[in-house]
A protein has these predicted regions:
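Amphipathic, interaction-prone secondary-structure segments
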Residues: 47-84
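Compact, glycine/acidic-enriched structural inserts
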Residues: 42, 89-154
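Intrinsically disordered, low-complexity regulatory segments enriched in Ser/Thr/Pro
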Residues: 75-114, 165-169, 173-176, 184
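Long, solvent-exposed, polar/charged low-complexity segments
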Residues: 1-41, 140-210
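Short, charged low-complexity intrinsically disordered segments located at boundaries
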Residues: 58-68, 102, 117, 151-163
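Short secondary-structure junction/hinge motifs that connect adjacent elements
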Residues: 32-56
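A generic structural signal for short, non-catalytic loop/turn and secondary-structure boundary residues
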Residues: 44-47, 63-65, 80, 89, ...
Length: 210
């Protein structure tokens, strides 16, 4: 799919993708629900609309993505209009992260404003994540262009240009061979990632009521 990101290639590989990617990803979701959402009584939608689609919504052009991602979201919102604790499957890696972007409208505006206004707190939270292997990135639009700068070393100040961002990402990835070696223990790594990302998640979500 990465070499031929088009609907015809998707049709050829649909059964394989379902058996080896989509269905295991759903079981991964189920494990997160049982081991994280339910025990902590988190108010998340975990069934409807939590997964991305392989085929692009590109007005009939027939394009497709070469990765899948999922994120739970709070009732009353949608996956794209909430702060996203995301889980992503790529051909060569798996990623955990946190994203907030302009699709979230007022929530994004409040989260960005709090980050800029309370920069000392934001830096402390971000630097802890960076030291744990996460990278910070942002872009002037909701999708991040390839090659856009990422920050993987502790910051002395918030990066220039952050105030004009339309999307902010904080992500940690592991390579494909490590994903395969982990097997079912990938869920344990996911639970650790949720714990690591939770302070920043609360910092952004609580900006609505700050």
């Amino acid at each position: 799919m990465r070499q031929e990101p088009h609907i015809e290639q998707y049709r050829k590989e649909k059964a394989t993708l379902k058996a080896h990617i989509q269905e295991p990803f759903k079981r991964y979701r189920d494990d997160l629900v049982v081991n994280w959402v339910l025990p902590h009584q988190l108010p998340f939608e975990t069934e409807r609309g939590v997964f991305s689609r392989i085929l692009k919504n590109d007005f009939g052009a027939g394009g497709s993505h070469h990765h899948l991602w999922m994120a739970f979201y709070r009732p009353g919102r949608k996956r794209l209009t909430d702060v996203q604790l995301s889980h992503s499957v790529y051909p060569d890696r798996f990623a955990w992260g946190l994203y907030v972007g302009a699709y979230a409208k007022g929530l994004f505006r409040d989260a960005l404003a709090r980050t800029l206004d309370e920069d000392a707190i934001a830096l402390d939270v971000l630097n802890v994540l960076i030291e744990q292997g996460y990278r910070l990135a942002f872009a002037p639009r909701v999708s991040r262009p390839a090659g856009h700068p990422e920050f993987d070393a502790p910051l002395d100040a918030l990066p220039d240009g952050l105030a004009k961002a339309q999307g902010i990402w904080v992500r940690r990835t592991i390579p494909r061979n490590q994903v395969l070696a982990l097997g079912p223990d990938l869920v344990a790594e996911a639970l650790r990632a949720q714990e690591e990302l939770w302070p920043l998640y609360r910092f952004w979500v609580d900006a609505e009521n700050a």
